[in-house]
Amino acid sequence: RDLTVTGVQTCALPIWLDELGAEKKLEKFRKKRKNFLYPSFNTIAGSGPNGAIIHYRANKKTNRKIKSKDIFLCDSGGQYKYGTTDVTRTICFAKPNNRIKNIFTRVLKGHIAVATAELNKLNTGYKLDKKARHWLNKINLDYGHGTGHGVGYFLNVHEGPQAISKYNNIKLQNGMILSNEPGYYEKNKDRKSVV
């Protein structure tokens, strides 16, 4: 339930905030949850071109206002009494063009492919990663990170040995908890927009 509430609250962040303000507002939302203890990692809140930087961290120098024409990426997590979370949301405040819709749909298909995979057939992170990238690869696109990682409990939010990655052949087993985070990040030449 707390994870669902956090996802909804992320989408409800007002566009008049800047990136640092969005980070603070999201943490304020989380602190109101009964079982919340502290963030599981530093929030990634990237607007426009900053959203195309994998593992971007806003600071006073790079902080941008979230504009209605921008795509906004928010990746955050919390340590709760019952477990650790890692939630990523991409929000397009304006009407997306056909290219953005196409890419978003392909990323979503990759996410669904991982979420619905039969683990007895796709029993390694390598095989799942290939399935996640399939729809982007069909149009010669890819992303430069693993599709998912092990999620710890009060340790590291990125925890192994399990992962969904091109380089991970660890056999997946019952009880292993993994994130499912395919994506696509593109900087254009003028650095004004991001897919």
Descriptions of predicted regions:
Residues 1-11, 194:
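Single conserved hydrophobic/aromatic residue that forms the stacking wall/gate
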Residues 1-3, 33-34, 62, 168:
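Short, flexible, glycine/charge-rich loop motifs used to bind or transfer phosphoryl groups or to couple energy/partner
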Residues 8, 12-139, 144-146, 154-156:
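Hydrophobic, small-residue-rich alpha-helical packing segments that form membrane-like cores
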Residues 52-81, 159-195:
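Acidic/histidine-enriched ion/cofactor-binding microenvironments in catalytic or ligand-binding pockets
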